[in-house]
Regions:
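Short beta-loop-alpha junction of Rossmann-like oxidoreductase domains
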Residues: 110-111, 161-163, 167
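Short coil/turn segments at alpha/beta junctions that flank glycine-rich nucleotide-binding fingerprints
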Residues: 145-149, 165, 210
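C-terminal substrate-binding subdomain of Rossmann-fold SDR/epimerase-dehydratase oxidoreductases
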Residues: 22-25, 29, 170, 176-304
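Activation loop
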Residues: 4-7, 103, 112, 168, ...
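Conserved active-site helix of classical SDR/Rossmann-fold NAD(P)-dependent CH-OH oxidoreductases
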Residues: 69-70, 133-140, 170-173, 201-202, ...
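Short, cationic motifs built from Arg/Lys/His that form the positively charged side of catalytic pockets
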Residues: 132, 154-157, 162, 192, ...
Length: 304
């Protein structure tokens, strides 16, 4: 439901771009795609990702995020093996890689101090994060069992242009512009690290080309913020009243704080985030102001 072909307008005429609509769980279709195209890299962004929806409808998260990932793994393994007829073959075509895009939510919650590092055990607390943790473990198992070439990245909260308006920042911007209530869970003091989408993309590109086979890399923006502080910043920037804020009952199992240690990717692969939150949120708010038609199409459902 969150997919929008308008987001691909800039690249739709690129000869390297091909859009195929299908269900990630459809083994026959996925195999067909691998058969038709010379695919040497899979970057698996495909996922149900909204925690609230996972609480209401966990099954679709489990089947999409877990089974869907396994379907992709099986197809890639089959088409990338040097000897497809040898089920024990652990040799793959040169340059192939499966890059699983995951989330810091798989680690669970932190107290007032500390940060997530890649060696921490996975302790997910929502159906969404549990489904992503499960997918991560399956990807890892394919590497350990079949010698399959993989990397896993775990990022903090993303923000920036083109984000579906069920997410915190675009939701608050859109509601502010319409003078609608701004729903804030609990006391609003849940803390998240925020990563601009451009920084996330550059990190993924870095891991794709430099990542050590089998390794996990945390991707963080070094921008810890409480939810309520972000809401108030958006209100101030748009010149609205804090009376729009409505504190609502907290989400079940709501993690209090996430913080991500990105030392591994910065020291070993040479990546670092470019955006400060102050710069990124200013540009993001301006993008939504400049693209009201885009967000109206989303909210109205006309984009479907």
């Amino acid at each position: 439901y969150a997919g929008n072909l308008e987001n691909f307008k800039e690249i739709e005429n690129n000869p390297n771009y091909k859009f195929i609509k299908c269900d990630i769980r459809d083994r026959k279709k996925i195999d067909e795609i691998f058969h038709l195209y010379d695919i040497d890299v899979v970057i698996n962004f495909a996922a149900e990702s909204h925690v609230d929806r996972s609480i209401e409808e966990p099954e679709v998260f489990l089947t999409t995020n877990i089974i869907g990932t396994q379907v992709l793994l099986d197809a890639a393994k089959k088409f990338w093996k040097v000897n497809p007829n040898d089920k024990y073959c652990k040799e793959y075509k040169p340059g192939v890689k499966f890059l699983q895009i995951s989330t810091d939510e798989v680690y669970g919650a932190l107290g007032k101090t500390g940060m997530f590092v890649e060696t921490m055990p996975l302790m997910p607390n929502s159906p969404y994060s549990a489904s992503k943790a499960s997918a991560d473990m399956i990807v890892r198992a394919y590497h350990k069992t079949y010698g399959f070439p993989i990397n896993i990245t775990r990022c903090s909260n993303n923000y920036g242009p083109y984000q579906f308006p069920e997410k915190l920042i675009p939701l608050m911007i859109n509601n502010c512009l319409k003078e609608k209530e701004l729903p804030v869970y609990g006391d609003g003091m849940q803390v998240r690290d925020w990563l601009h989408v451009s920084d996330h993309c550059s990190a993924i590109d870095t891991v794709l080309h430099k990542g050590v086979d089998g390794e996990v890399y945390n991707i963080g923006g070094n921008n810890e913020k409480a939810n309520i502080d972000i809401v108030k910043l958006i209100i101030r920037t748009l010149g609205k009243s804090e009376n729009l804020i409505k504190y609502v009952k907290d989400r079940p199992g709501h993690d209090r704080r996430y913080a991500i240690d990105n030392t591994k990717i910065t020291t070993e692969l040479g990546w670092k985030p470019v955006y400060t939150f102050e710069q990124g949120i200013k540009e993001t708010i301006q993008w939504y102001l400049d693209n009201t038609e885009w967000i109206e199409n989303i909210v109205s459902g006309d984009y479907v």
